[in-house]
């Protein structure tokens, strides 16, 4: 892999952005740029790349950062042009252009959030590796999670309630990525959307809810214990009780005893 000089990199990225009116040409030139600085000596196992199973160019980190910083500005300033570029990048097989597409998608303005959700849903259903879903949702919902978290949570709730098992898997990883990224102050919003699903949980949704509950415990055990006690006080659903009992080993000893004591009062 040839070394890349920062002034050349900056100039090259600016030249690429001048092709924004010709998305196909831009992506063609960008692909050649990726290929020119690919690490052909990379061997799996020498160092870790959180990339699922997608083939990767293994370009210099500086190059990927510079491209992402520049291209997300196009998303903010010229969103319609950015969408065309995003769709072409997402059609590539390699990791780097797909991650760039997700980063651009995640910085489209609020009026484009419906298009953001539509693309993420389509892309996610075609992904096999959980690791790829994690970075896809983290990058692709960056602005939506900041400006309209409820809109994103409503979509995840719809997927979780769907009759399509593929949507359940997508919803779990979407919600997991949001929980992992959430501040403690935003957890109540997540609990709000989970509440009806937990109260009406069934054998169909039980595995997905177990995974989500595990992530919530890791994020904030105390908040999650309080949330579960509220649920148990509002529902006689035996599946919910089973879910809580099966999840007890995930809690600390003190939290387990607190929940067992609460269960005995029901």
Regions found by a protein language model. Name each.
Residues 74, 78, 92-93, 108, ...:
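Short coil/turn helix-boundary motifs
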Residues 43, 77-87, 110-122, 146-158, ...:
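Amphipathic alpha-helical scaffolding segments comprising HEAT/armadillo-like alpha-solenoid repeats
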Residues 95-96, 126-134, 165-166, 199-207, ...:
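Alpha-helix N-cap/helix-start positions at coil->helix boundaries
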Residues 1-88, 217, 232-266:
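N-terminal alpha-helical scaffold/docking segments in eukaryotic complex subunits
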Residues 189, 193, 204-212, 223, ...:
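Short amphipathic alpha-helical segments
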Residues 88-132:
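Hydrophobic alpha-helical segments and helix pairs
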Residues 36, 51-77, 99-110, 132-147, ...:
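Structural detector for internal amphipathic alpha-helices that build alpha-solenoid repeat scaffolds
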Residues 165-197:
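A mid-sequence, solvent-exposed acidic-amphipathic segment
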């Amino acid at each position: 892999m040839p070394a890349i000089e920062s002034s050349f990199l900056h100039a090259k990225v600016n030249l690429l952005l001048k092709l924004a009116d010709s998305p196909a040409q831009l992506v063609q030139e960008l692909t050649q740029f990726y290929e020119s600085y690919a690490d052909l000596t990379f061997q799996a196992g020498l160092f870790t790349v959180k990339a699922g199973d997608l083939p990767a160019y293994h370009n210099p980190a500086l190059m990927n950062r510079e491209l992402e910083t520049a291209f997300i500005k196009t998303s903010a300033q010229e969103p319609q042009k950015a969408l065309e570029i995003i769709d072409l990048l997402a059609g590539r097989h390699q990791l780097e252009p797909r991650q760039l597409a997700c980063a651009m998608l995640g910085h489209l303005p609020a009026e484009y959030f419906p298009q953001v959700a539509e693309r993420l849903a389509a892309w996610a259903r075609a992904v096999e590796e959980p690791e790829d879903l994690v970075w896809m949702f983290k990058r692709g919902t960056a602005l939506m999670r900041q400006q309209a978290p409820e809109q994103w949570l409503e979509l995840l709730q719809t997927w979780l309630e769907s009759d399509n098992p593929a949507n359940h898997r997508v919803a779990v990883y979407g919600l997991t990525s949001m929980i992992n990224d959430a501040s403690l102050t935003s957890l109540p919003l997540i609990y709000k959307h989970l509440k009806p699903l937990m109260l009406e949980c069934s054998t169909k949704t039980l595995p997905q809810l177990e995974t989500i509950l595990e992530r919530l415990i890791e994020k904030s055990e105390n908040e999650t214990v309080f949330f579960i006690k509220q649920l148990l006080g509002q529902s006689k659903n035996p599946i919910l009780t089973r879910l809580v009992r099966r999840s007890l080993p995930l809690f600390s000893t003190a939290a387990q005893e607190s929940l067992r004591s609460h269960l005995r009062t029901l």
